[in-house]
């Protein structure tokens, strides 16, 4: 592994330098330009942290829809300076790359290959750079998710559950990983009975499902559930004691019932916009979860043996079919991309084409969105059409990734360089 350390340090150094440069540039843009570089939520985080230092509820700050833990973590913004939070998120960004590197090495990737995947898909990727340097907290969730999945594959169930519980507390979406993690833990290193060689489960409709449910409830699954549940319950009880119902309402319930009628990448946004005052609005919002639920169940059963790949598909599907979809949500699945890249066997031309389509889909959406946001033109239909096209592009990319993905055993082979 020694041969990979200099390369990893160089990649981390380059990633750090790029992110710090963007943080400093953000100070300039915020001072002289109309459109601020810093994420609007970062001001919300800082205001909530200031309220916490005064012994008040962070939910006194309008639009603070997060766990109070985030406000607590950013209290140095008040005492040391407002750059602290951005530097914390940048550190989380780099830590996520470090965890991804270790996961790749465990899965059998050479030091050079692991370093290259982390650099290309994360460290030198402009999207994660921009998200963390603008003051968005997604990197903290990313490092916890990566650590949880890596520790599950490494057999450290207790520590994996600890990271998973913290991740779910920060953001609800990792809760969707519960089923594939449980299925992955059921075998404890042995293949599940009735599963195909490619990891696809084969079972009868009733008897097979029941047998699988019984098998899933083994020692590792119960330990994982107990630890993760205890972490989540302890934090929930603590913050409920401190801040009462408004904590549950803003940190959890708001996100479950959220119906954002502002323009975003979601294919549902225009429908929710038009039906905002309808008596069927709430029911339509709930119905939007059904395609997600069905697809997530299918992916869980089909690909649980390769946990990182399964969770990558999970997250990409969840984001693409969600009622609300913004650019920062892409980080949720991009952080898993470095780990699955070595198993995607496609030509570089096809890969470049898929990357071009992904960026082109965003560009086609951003053009009418800009005209609406800054020029006041009524471009809702064009934005919705671009969102539908982007959903088709994302679906096509996922189909291509699945069809060109070659699964390998999750027990990493012995690497020569230790």
Swiss-Prot record:
Cytoplasmic topological domain residue ranges: 1-6, 101-136, 242-281, 345-351, 400-418
GO terms under biological process: GPI anchor biosynthetic process
EC numbers: 2.4.1.-
Membrane topology annotation: Multi-pass membrane protein
Ranges that cross the membrane: 7-27, 80-100, 137-157, 221-241, 282-302, 324-344, 352-372, 379-399
GO cellular component, one term: glycosylphosphatidylinositol-mannosyltransferase I complex
Listed pathway(s): Glycolipid biosynthesis; glycosylphosphatidylinositol-anchor biosynthesis
Keyword set, alphabetical order: Endoplasmic reticulum, Glycosyltransferase, GPI-anchor biosynthesis, Membrane, Transferase, Transmembrane, Transmembrane helix
Function: Catalytic subunit of the glycosylphosphatidylinositol-mannosyltransferase I complex which catalyzes the transfer of the first mannose, via an alpha-1,4 bond from a dolichol-phosphate-mannose (Dol-P-Man) to the glucosaminyl acyl phosphatidylinositol (GlcN-(acyl)PI) intermediate to generate alpha-D-Man-(1->4)-alpha-D-GlcN-(1->6)-(1-radyl,2-acyl-sn-glycero-3-phospho)-2-acyl-inositol and participates in the sixth step of the glycosylphosphatidylinositol-anchor biosynthesis.
PANTHER family from the UniProt entry: GPI MANNOSYLTRANSFERASE 1, PIG-M MANNOSYLTRANSFERASE
This protein's name: GPI alpha-1,4-mannosyltransferase I, catalytic subunit
Gene: PIGM
